[in-house]
Swiss-Prot record:
Annotated source species: Acinetobacter baumannii (strain AYE)
Subcellular location: Cytoplasm
NCBIfam families in alphabetical order: pheS
Cofactor info, note text: Binds 2 magnesium ions per tetramer.
Cofactor(s) the protein requires to work: Mg(2+)
Gene name per UniProt: pheS
Protein name in the entry: Phenylalanine--tRNA ligase alpha subunit
Length: 330
């Protein structure tokens, strides 16, 4: 009878301690105190071994009942404390849905990329394929194979970024044309977009800029065909019928060569690109017989086209990461 009363008192004390626990840490301390390995309940369980069988049966059942009562109370209190903690957290993190929301920032394609894709799309519709090549180029593909002699100004250190005597950052995408001619048989019809590099930086020049060059090699190409293609490009890109003129010029890799101008709204001629018939030496260097095949080539600056199309007077604005400027092209 003495042990049974002790269990009743233990149960009462444990339930009171459980109810008084104000957080999960305190509740765990109560659990250890009343059901742990060193608790009074554990000591009474050890004492069962010294009792006779009949008494052990009665007291064992009583101890089990007390343990179950305490564990149930612990579980209920734990659930209540967890719910209270969650409610408190939700209350402290409540969002005022009456406040104005923040607009979603929407990204867009960079204007230079937009212009490059627009130009490439024109040429792919005309039957050209897009070809790419390395930006770190060797001297042969960047200069030698393009009929650019060793004394040419473009080879000077102040115009070209050199890694060593034979490797450099390409100054144009013409090297892609040479590599394509070396590995393909005519007819060849490609455009070569990409980044190019020159030692130049001012309002209309950048050390890094984008070019698109084109090449068409076949048995019966002509300057008239080149002229018609480029006039169609300019009219479609600027979405108007432009006055276009072809001025005689000089490029080492084309002969004859021309620069192409368009007339603006004020009646001024603006240079937009260069072109010409591929020089026989260039065809020969790529392993193509110039007596059998002819070709024409052209090259334009993507930023130049973008500036003319959108009325931008400083090329550097494209690369200043000013969202106010770039947002206009979204």
């Amino acid at each position: 009878m003495r042990v049974t009363m002790s269990l009743e008192a233990l149960t009462t004390e444990a339930l009171a301690a459980i109810a008084a626990a104000q957080d999960l840490v305190a509740l765990d301390q109560v659990r250890v105190q009343f059901t742990g390995k060193k608790s009074q309940l554990a000591e009474q369980s050890k004492a069962l071994g010294k009792m006779d069988p009949e008494e052990r049966k009665v007291q064992g059942a009583a101890i089990h009942a007390v343990r179950e009562t305490i564990n149930n109370a612990l579980t209920e209190r734990q659930t209540a404390l967890q719910q209270a903690a969650l409610a408190q957290k939700l209350a402290s993190e409540t969002i005022d849905i009456t406040l104005p929301g923040r607009g979603q920032c929407v990204g867009t394609v960079h204007p230079v990329t937009q212009v490059q894709e627009r130009i490439c799309q024109f040429f792919t519709k005309a039957g050209f394929t897009v070809a790419t090549g390395p930006e770190v180029e060797d001297d042969y593909h960047n200069f030698e194979a393009l009929n650019i002699p060793g004394h040419h100004p473009a080879r000077a250190m102040h115009d070209t970024f050199y890694f060593d005597a034979n490797h450099l950052l390409r100054t144009h995408t013409s090297g892609v044309q040479i590599r394509t001619m070396e590995t393909s048989q005519p007819p060849i019809r490609i455009v070569c977009p990409g980044r190019v590099y020159r030692c130049d930086s001012d309002q209309t020049h950048s050390p890094m800029f984008h070019q698109i060059e084109g090449l068409y090699v076949a048995e019966n190409t002509s300057f008239a065909e080149l002229k018609g293609l480029l006039i169609n490009l300019l009219n479609e890109f600027f979405e108007k019928d432009l006055k276009v003129r072809f001025r005689p010029s000089y490029f080492p890799f084309t002969e004859p060569s021309a620069e192409v101008d368009i007339m603006d709204e004020r009646g001024r001629w603006l240079e937009v690109l260069g072109c010409g018939m591929v020089h026989p030496n260039v065809l020969r260097a790529a392993g193509i017989d110039p007596d059998k095949y002819k070709g024409f080539a052209f090259g334009l600056g993507v930023e130049r086209f973008a500036m003319l199309r959108y009325g931008i007077n400083d090329l550097r604005m494209f690369y200043q990461n000013d969202v106010r400027f770039l947002r206009q092209f979204a």
